[in-house]
Amino acid sequence: MDELKEIKLKNYQYLNEVAIKGETLFTGSSLMELFPICEIARSRGVDGIIYNRGISGLNTDEFLQHIHPLLLDLQPSKVFINIGTNDMTEEPYGDQWFQHLTANIRRILEQTQAVLPHTKIYLMAFYPANLHLPWQTPVSIQWMKLRTPENLDRCNQALEEIAQTHGCHFINCNDGLVNDRKEQKAEHTYDGVHLYANAYLKVFEALEPYLLN
């Protein structure tokens, strides 16, 4: 874990000391950290407390290593998890990246249920990516080359099956995000992966019923 991640993790540890237990938690990687969930929810009339414990660049190994400050310590009544896209890489996993990712997702759910048996767990589908934006560079394309519609669909099918097997909820918020090639719409993203707030507003519309339930 690099220095910036360590700093964010330490801040979360301090915040967890004063956090109210039993509230709603959003946690995961950058796609969760960058989700302005608290502002959007409040502007839509949601009054409950929502915590965000996302950390940019986090993979599932790191999440498991630090699952207490990122999830368990808050003892949430509901947790929305979006983690795993940073495992979609040939380094260090090679052609075993998919098996590694799905095995760790299972571990995350199992560890959460073992410690927090009454917490409602919502596993979120990976968002679409776009590898065909005109401003992308060879470096950025190489970084995200495995995030094809086919690979993302494969991951999301696996996430849904894992959630069902473990008695959790699976949420796919992607209907309003994709173009006719099943890629992220260009107006939603600045690098092909990370989202502008206009995309997160659509994500919120899809998950709001689960947030209010």
Residue spans of the language-model regions?
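Conserved SGNH/GDSL esterase-like catalytic core that processes O-acyl groups on lipids
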Residues: 2-103, 107
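Alpha-helix N-cap and loop-to-helix initiation/capping positions
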Residues: 96-101, 140-151, 191, 195
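Histidine-centered active-site loop/cap adjacent to the catalytic His
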Residues: 63, 187-213
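Substrate-gating cap/lid alpha-helix
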Residues: 131-172
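Short glycine/proline- and charge-enriched loop/turn segments
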Residues: 45-49, 135-145, 183-190
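A short helix->loop->beta-strand "cap" motif at the edges of active sites that frequently abuts
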Residues: 116-120
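Generic structural signal for well-ordered alpha-helices
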Residues: 105-110, 156
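Short acidic/His/Gly/Ser-rich catalytic and metal-binding motifs that mark active-site loops
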Residues: 88-90, 130-135, 178-184
